[in-house]
Amino acid sequence: MIELGVNIDHVATLRQARRTWEPDPTWAAVEAHLGGADGITVHLREDRRHIQDDDVRRLRELTQIKLNLEMAATDEMVGIARSIKPEMAMLVPEGRHEVTTEGGLDIVSQEARLKDVIARLADAGIVTSVFIDAEIAQIDAAARIGARVCEIHTGPYAHAFHAQGRDAESPAVLAEIDKIRRAGEAICSHGMRFNAGHALNYYNVQPIARLPGIRELHIGHAIVSRAVFSGIREAVAEMKRLMREAAAG
């Protein structure tokens, strides 16, 4: 059955706006779990703009569902991951001037370095995921470096969906869906796990959730935005219902 990993970074964004102690991302993780989340995702950025080191430690200690740590492939982050031991570490590109992750990781240009990073994480018992664009060359490279999971960047699909007035049958949207579908087939052919995420929301999630072979979606901003009005538990539960409805056909 398809799973939902809830990204709670923007709960921390709200807290950091006042440099105070609330809202607490750990409590958001608990509420997300109660709403049906299968995992919690946080991005410990090098500039610590939202999630802090202590947040990750507390989440590791207190949450009862799997923890996915998004991270740059740096020595500092590898050391933190090896110490905290999340169930999964997702390698992402990172730029200090970006508002959010703007594209997939370019594995092809840095295979040797990323292979070493994955080996160091695996040595600590951590499954490694890579966040990549829906490109066959990147998927093949992910398999070569030993990634266990590929998360396909759904931003281009989400942007097309919005630009086309939420028309899931428009040629532009169908082209993006087909690109992700073909990427998923390639991922599965390598024996890797097919995940997806980025800019998914309550309007565009179902065409992605019904793709063959897809295992998990990571969604954050849309859920936190909805939770401002409806509460995290209800927001997560509604997203999970939409995904399951789509996956069931």
UniProtKB/Swiss-Prot annotation:
UniProt xrefs under Pfam families: PdxJ
Query: Which catalytic reaction applies to this protein?
Result: 3-amino-2-oxopropyl phosphate + 1-deoxy-D-xylulose 5-phosphate = pyridoxine 5'-phosphate + phosphate + 2 H2O + H(+)
Which biological processes are named by the entry's GO terms? Answer: pyridoxine biosynthetic process
Where is this gene product found? Cytoplasm
List positions binding 3-amino-2-oxopropyl phosphate.
Answer: N7, R18, A199, G220, H221
* Active site positions: H43, E70, H198
At which residues is there a site annotated Transition state stabilizer? E151
Which pathway is it part of? Answer: Cofactor biosynthesis; pyridoxine 5'-phosphate biosynthesis; pyridoxine 5'-phosphate from D-erythrose 4-phosphate: step 5/5
Q: Record's InterPro entries?
A: Aldolase_TIM (IPR013785), PyrdxlP_synth_PdxJ (IPR004569), Pyridoxine-5'_phos_synth (IPR036130)
Picking any one GO molecular function of the record gives: pyridoxine 5'-phosphate synthase activity
Mention any one GO cellular component term assigned to this protein in its UniProt record: cytosol
Q: What is its EC number?
A: 2.6.99.2
Q: Does the keyword Transferase apply?
A: yes
Chain sites annotated for binding 1-deoxy-D-xylulose 5-phosphate: D9, H10, R45, H50, T100
Keywords (alphabetical) are: Cytoplasm, Pyridoxine biosynthesis, Transferase
Entry keyword annotation includes Transferase = yes
Q: Which family does it belong to?
A: Belongs to the PNP synthase family.
Role description:
Catalyzes the complicated ring closure reaction between the two acyclic compounds 1-deoxy-D-xylulose-5-phosphate (DXP) and 3-amino-2-oxopropyl phosphate (1-amino-acetone-3-phosphate or AAP) to form pyridoxine 5'-phosphate (PNP) and inorganic phosphate.
Q: Which NCBIfam families match?
A: pdxJ, PRK05265.1-3, PRK05265.1-5
Mind telling me which PANTHER family this protein's record contains? PYRIDOXINE 5'-PHOSPHATE SYNTHASE
Which HAMAP family does this chain map to?
Answer: PdxJ
Q: What is this protein called?
A: Pyridoxine 5'-phosphate synthase
- Please tell me the species this chain comes from: Azoarcus sp. (strain BH72)
